[in-house]
């Protein structure tokens, strides 16, 4: 499965870092807004102030964590594309596993293995859903079979013309 909308490999890393940062800031902002609202003292003004304060403090940190994950994932993915010479779902699955392992490298080895497995499984699920959606939607865009004419108007297989046409077999 080939993706045509992706940037070439050196720029893909920057593109994925920016996209991951944006996802982290938006998603983290929504989550932190709810969390800050719920944990603030009673009163609408206090709750709104707590919500904005939580977003201001935590959303950039969450976005940065997402950007690190996206950058490392894309770097490993581009390295595998270069090493293997082809771009397929196995690169993404392996990149997810290696990214999980590298980001958990400061922990105990068991946590590193667990993070690698979770990264690989998560990317395998994402790639599998992508392949299924591609196959499902590809059926919608197949060319329709050509319109068949009325078989009675087509010449017969023996070379005799259909009704209303003169026979030229005598001139052969």
From Swiss-Prot:
Keywords: Disulfide bond, Membrane, Mitochondrion, Mitochondrion inner membrane, Protein transport, Translocation, Transmembrane, Transmembrane helix, Transport. It comes from the Eukaryota. Its main location: mitochondrion. It is a multi-pass membrane protein. It is found in: Mitochondrion inner membrane. One of its GO terms (biological process) is protein import into mitochondrial matrix. One of its GO terms (cellular component) is TIM23 mitochondrial import inner membrane translocase complex. Residues 147-172 are annotated as: Disordered. Essential component of the TIM23 complex, a complex that mediates the translocation of transit peptide-containing proteins across the mitochondrial inner membrane. Component of the TIM23 complex at least composed of TIMM23, TIMM17 (TIMM17A or TIMM17B) and TIMM50. The complex interacts with the TIMM44 component of the PAM complex and with DNAJC15. Belongs to the Tim17/Tim22/Tim23 family. This is Mitochondrial import inner membrane translocase subunit Tim17-B.
